[in-house]
Amino acid sequence: MQIGADGLLHHLYWGAGLTDVPSFLYDRAPYRRAHMVEGQPASSPMCSREYFHYECPTFGTGDFRIAALTATAENTGLDLCDLQFVAYRISEGREELRGLPFAVGEAVETLEVLTEDPLTKLKISLFFHLFEDVDVITRHMRIENGGDCAVRISEAMSATVDFENGCFSLMSLDGTTLREFTPCIQPLRPGVTEIGSTRGASSHQHNPNIALLRADTNEVQGEVFSFSMLYSGSYTLRMEQDAYGALRVQGGIQPRGFGWRLMPAETFDTPEIALCWSDGGCNGLSGKLHAFVRNHLLRGPWAHQVRPLLLNTWEACYFDVNEERLLKVGEAAARHGVELLVLDDGWFGCRNAANSSLGDWFCNSEK
């Protein structure tokens, strides 16, 4: 990333290691002609904000693509926010994300970048947590109301990543009951594409994980970029490809149905999102994410041990459960090393089919 001449935090690159950074920065110099309908700083009339890549783009500043933050001051109704760079800090370790799930680790490095809107005094801290052992970066945003009036937040993304070359296929995991996690691959087109949930839960309709695949990517080779929400509520993973083929990707809280009133001196943290890159195809990505979950998400004594085995009665019995049958299933399972038998559906009320007795939480003694 880089601090631009406009004072904003610019996104430069994410991917394989670079060997010649100066040449890369030279090639990134803006060249597109400014248009009269686009916002650009008076000092750089050839540099339109619509074409720059940003770490935290906001609404109403000349960047007409999807925004990472929309906040409205209650006293003026102003919903424009121009986040100027203030300071940054690099530290070892990380702080807890209160009330939300987050990744942990012994060798974590954290970059915190502070920006502020000069007019509303809204302060935005962008957090980048580097898990170098698995090539994963987790990100979230903290919003602090430094002004003297309440602010209404209606849009708050955990991360934004802009790609100069947005030629990708999108892989998502979709489905429903009994056919969850069905891979779906589709090419990205100009305009907005969204995977998300408005159910109050992440849901099995659309899993809160996506991957972007290059044209030559397969199971064992090619670039893959993944975005995984560490969040079980309503979410969005959305992309916008512009007329020049550049792509913006964002992940965060689902804006539909979301609104947060932030009083002066209060803070609001967005959920964490995990970003992972691999040049070893989908299999390489899976390996990195598997290691990330095992080493940095799982908690407690079983994180690195073989877990106890259990058998759930659903697939074996469905609703047809009774004492004699359960004993036979349990005895057979025990012979194979199973340590726990879980009685699933069919034990309560007149629960003999899926259309009866939900809520009748009393034991069916006849079974």
Predicted regions mapped to residue ranges:
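Short Pro-Gly-centered flexible turn/kink motifs
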Residues: D82-F85, W260-D279
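Aromatic-lined carbohydrate-binding/catalytic grooves of carbohydrate-active enzymes
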Residues: W302-K367
